[in-house]
Amino acid sequence: MGVKCVDLLAAHQGLWLDDHGYQDPVPIKEKLDDHGLTCPVFTPENCSYGYQFAAKEPELKERCFRYFSNGIKFGHELGATILEANSGWGYWNEPEEEGFKRSVEMFQRLSEVAAENDMMIACESLRPQESLIGWRIDQIKHLFDEVNHPNFKVMIDLTAMSVAGETIQQWFDTFGTENIIHSHFQDCNPYGHFVWGDGNRNLKQDILDMLNNGYTGKFT
């Protein structure tokens, strides 16, 4: 098939990762090597599990920090250089700013762990049904500016971007090519995560928009 890179998702029933530790990465790395594959991007499950970047309760906050820290270390041992993340979602019964402040704090701490492990964090936006604090480009820019760490970057998710009514060009104009290091590149309408042709996006134009802005990251 010509596939050379994989974005591994640490989630049941694939890879075991929690706030206490993670499975032995050596057999996984050996399988990748045996098949001529690399894992440039590592994604700890952060949507369907209880771990999130803007957790409120002190115990949960620390468990989330340990979980994502373990994800950074796990990814590093598999040869990844990017940890995929999202903004976190805050709580629906509190002001947006409260969840936002916790997300900033979490990413500042995790960015230090990433730096120690030669990893970058790539943060995507979510949909308005998923997050109060990170579904629009201005919110992600605010988060990016407040975290203010060289190991904290952003990524484009075509579905979240489409739902928000944004464009690829807006993202490059807002963040600059050097700060967009990854992409979730799927068809949508505007919701959904579809194979290309099942949604209404223009594949050729989207690729051209990415490449014409100097994008050199992966498409997953």
Task: Name these PLM-found stretches.
Residues L15, A54-E59, V195-G197:
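Short glycine-enriched, charge-decorated loop/helix-capping segments at active-site entrances
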Residues D19-T38, R66-E77, V104-E112, T167-T177, ...:
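Short amphipathic alpha-helices and their capping/turn segments at secondary-structure boundaries
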